């Protein structure tokens, strides 16, 4: 099937969902050769991926991932595609802890660093979280603490078949955006940051196709795959199949914009310290604003409250230290 798909794509033809699913199934099953995978990914990148193709690929990735049963009615993932080359601290990781402290259920899916010095897994590991915790431990953490971490390497073992071709062709591929769409918990709420504004509306539709009920796809207009504390952010918010694209300006909510340099992180150890200093209230600069914006948006989604209320709740959590307590409980639970 993959050879037929390559032949169609090089002619500029799109794949229907059935063919796209069949090709991804071949890749994830180890049936496709590395040459075929490299050719397919290159041709697809040149043609450009459609909503149906991305949806089908993500569905098959989910089928091949390890089992995880959330045990809660609604759970959110707060995640970015990466690829913005900004080198920020782990904004979504800290925001996830704040969201959990505010009552949201957060199934955080992530990996080690790809385009930066420190990925979610690296930061959590440096904080003392057991990132390779047993599935049952993670299920209990989500249910009892409101947060868990699902290590991509642990759940997506079939990705070993695409590692070498991706490294060798050295171009962006559809897998750059598939990771955030393939959460093993199949989170039905999502705050997804993307590295390119052209992905905002299409990926909102993909998430809806995948069964995500409510969420936001965001792109900072400074290039960040987060809600930006530096400038405005383009957002596509969706709710049960209804889509609304708008621009969020932090100054309209009383925030002072910061310089991009304020958001820069470093090594896993440095980012872990930044996380603790934000959660304990020691950091009050643009890093804090970035967390309030992103955690507040997540709480808007999970708690069905306004953005203003979400931002206020996130600020209260940072002020009262409950986010730090959530981290401490999370560390203890994963190492029990």
Predicted regions, residues:
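Acidic, glycine/proline-rich low-complexity segments that act as flexible tails and inter-domain linkers
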Residues: 1-87, 98, 102, 257-263, ...
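Glycine-rich anion-binding loops and their surrounding alpha/beta cores
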Residues: 8, 63-66, 88, 103, ...
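Gly/Ser/Thr-rich beta-alpha loop segments that engage phosphate groups in nucleotides
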Residues: 14, 84-85, 112, 121, ...
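Short beta-strand segments at enzyme active-site cores
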Residues: 36-37, 107-109, 217
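Short amphipathic alpha-helical face segments that pack within enzyme cores
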Residues: 39, 94-98, 290, 294-297
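Core alpha/beta catalytic barrel or barrel-like domain that forms the active/cofactor pocket
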Residues: 69-79, 107-113, 175-181
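Acidic, glycine-rich active-site loops and adjacent beta-strand->loop/helix elements
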Residues: 80-85, 110-116, 155, 221-222
């Amino acid at each position: 099937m993959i050879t037929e798909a390559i032949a169609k794509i090089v002619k500029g033809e799109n794949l229907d969902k059935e063919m796209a699913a069949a090709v991804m199934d071949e890749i994830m099953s180890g049936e496709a050769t590395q040459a075929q995978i490299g050719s397919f990914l290159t041709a697809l990148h040149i043609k450009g991926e459609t909503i149906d193709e991305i949806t089908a690929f993500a569905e098959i990735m989910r089928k091949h991932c390890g089992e995880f049963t959330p045990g809660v009615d609604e759970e959110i993932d707060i995640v970015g595609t990466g690829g913005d080359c900004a080198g920020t601290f782990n904004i979504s990781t800290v925001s996830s802890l704040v969201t959990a402290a505010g009552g949201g259920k957060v199934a955080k899916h992530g990996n080690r660093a790809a385009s930066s010095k420190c990925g979610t897994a690296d930061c959590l590991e440096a904080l003392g979280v057991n990132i390779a915790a047993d599935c049952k431990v993670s299920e209990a953490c989500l249910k009892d603490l409101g947060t868990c971490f699902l290590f991509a390497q642990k759940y997506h073992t079939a990705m070993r078949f695409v590692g070498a071709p991706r490294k060798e062709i050295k171009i962006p591929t559809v897998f750059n955006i598939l990771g955030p769409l393939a959460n093993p918990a199949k989170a039905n709420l999502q705050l997804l940051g993307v590295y390119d504004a052209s992905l905002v509306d299409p990926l909102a539709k993909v998430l809806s196709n995948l069964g995500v009920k409510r969420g936001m796809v965001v792109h900072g207009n400074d290039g960040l795959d987060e809600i930006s504390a530096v400038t405005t952010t383009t957002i596509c918010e969706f709710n049960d199949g209804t889509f609304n694209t708008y621009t969020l300006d932090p100054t309209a909510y009383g925030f002072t914009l910061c310089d991009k340099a304020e958001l820069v992180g470093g090594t896993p150890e440095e980012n872990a310290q930044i996380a603790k200093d934000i959660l304990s209230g020691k950091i009050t600069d643009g890093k804090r604003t970035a967390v309030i914006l992103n955690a507040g948006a997540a709480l808007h989604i999970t708690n069905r409250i306004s953005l203003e209320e979400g931002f206020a709740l996130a600020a209260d959590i940072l002020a009262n230290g409950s986010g730090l307590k959530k981290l401490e409980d999370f560390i203890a639970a994963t190492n029990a």
